[in-house]
UniProtKB/Swiss-Prot annotation:
Region entry Pro-Pro-Arg motif necessary for proteolytic processing, spans: 57-59
UniProt organism field: Platymeris rhadamanthus
Protein name: U-reduvitoxin-Pr11a
Cited function: Inhibits trypsin activity and prophenoloxidase (PPO) activation, an enzyme essential for both clotting and insect innate immune responses. It does not inhibit activity of chymotrypsin and protease K, and has no effect on phenoloxidase (PO) activity.
InterPro entries per UniProt: Pacifastin_dom, Pacifastin_dom_sf
Site for Reactive bond, residues: 93-94
One cellular-component annotation, GO: extracellular region
Disulphide connectivity of cysteines: 24-42, 37-56, 40-51, 65-82, 77-96, 80-91
Signal sequence region: 1-20
């Protein structure tokens, strides 16, 4: 049981590390964060390390939506709310890992 639990945590860590490392092509580089607003620094191993945590402007969508409804952003982790006229939406700007 302990071995299985260890393997689950190890695979989860590898998956997250692999996803984050794709953003860095060289150590020490500064790249745009996954939220599209903040910036992150790449570690010596080339993985995303330290990111700014500025408040980002609201994200908008490019198609109409049903007024007042909420839905998941295309990134899969942020949530959006449709405006009263159905022409815009405001979305959260969480860092998605």
């Amino acid at each position: 049981m302990k071995t299985a639990l260890f393997l689950v945590f190890a695979l989860a860590f590898i998956a997250v590390e692999g996803k984050m490392s794709r953003a860095c092509s060289k150590p020490g580089q500064t790249v745009l964060a996954p939220d599209g607003c903040n910036h992150c620094r790449c570690s010596e191993k080339g993985i995303l390390m330290a990111c700014t945590k500025m408040m980002c402007p609201p994200r908008t969508i490019e198609k109409s939506c049903k007024p007042g409804t909420t839905f998941k952003h295309k990134d899969g982790c942020n949530t959006c709310k449709c405006s009263d006229d159905g022409k815009n939406a405001l979305c959260t700007s969480k860092l998605c890992l």
